[in-house]
Amino acid sequence: MARIAGVNIPNHKHAEIALTAIYGIGRSRAQKICDAANVVRSVKMKDLTESDMERLRDEVAKFIVEGDLRRETTMNIKRLMDLGCYRGVRHRRGLPLRGQRTRTNARTRKGPRKAIAGKK
């Protein structure tokens, strides 16, 4: 298995798909990386030469991925919570942030239902 940005990349997948194993790289960014590195998107990772792999590593290094991206995201959320703004309060309470209704639905964000005694 090849290692790019500290992640084991699956050998049996096409280069474009295999790059999406890295946190912060989706399909469109993977396509741009392959094009910039002059790597054919449809070639399997195991068939790439070492120079191709090096070019891919250099292109991926230009982006914020993996641990740095996770850290940046958590720091942004923590900043909102410390500010005490509306979005920060919603994060703190575990409720939806973007104006969705909460009287019904919002189960994913709120978690499983909590039983309330005498609610009948």
Curated annotation (Swiss-Prot):
Superkingdom of source: Bacteria
Keyword annotations from UniProtKB, A to Z: Ribonucleoprotein, Ribosomal protein, RNA-binding, rRNA-binding, tRNA-binding
Record-level GO cellular component terms: cytosol; small ribosomal subunit
Gene Ontology biological process terms from the UniProt entry: translation
Pfam family, one: Ribosomal_S13
Region Disordered, annotated ranges: 94-120
A GO MF label: tRNA binding
Gene3D superfamilies, per database record: 1.10.8.50, 30s ribosomal protein s13, domain 2 (4.10.910.10)
Annotated family: Belongs to the universal ribosomal protein uS13 family.
PANTHER family registered for this protein in UniProt: 30S RIBOSOMAL PROTEIN S13/40S RIBOSOMAL PROTEIN S18, SMALL RIBOSOMAL SUBUNIT PROTEIN US13M
Subunit composition and interactions: Part of the 30S ribosomal subunit. Forms a loose heterodimer with protein S19. Forms two bridges to the 50S subunit in the 70S ribosome.
Stored HAMAP family: Ribosomal_uS13 (MF_01315)
Role this protein plays: Located at the top of the head of the 30S subunit, it contacts several helices of the 16S rRNA. In the 70S ribosome it contacts the 23S rRNA (bridge B1a) and protein L5 of the 50S subunit (bridge B1b), connecting the 2 subunits; these bridges are implicated in subunit movement. Contacts the tRNAs in the A and P-sites.
Protein name: Small ribosomal subunit protein uS13
Originating organism: Aromatoleum aromaticum (strain DSM 19018 / LMG 30748 / EbN1) (Azoarcus sp. (strain EbN1))
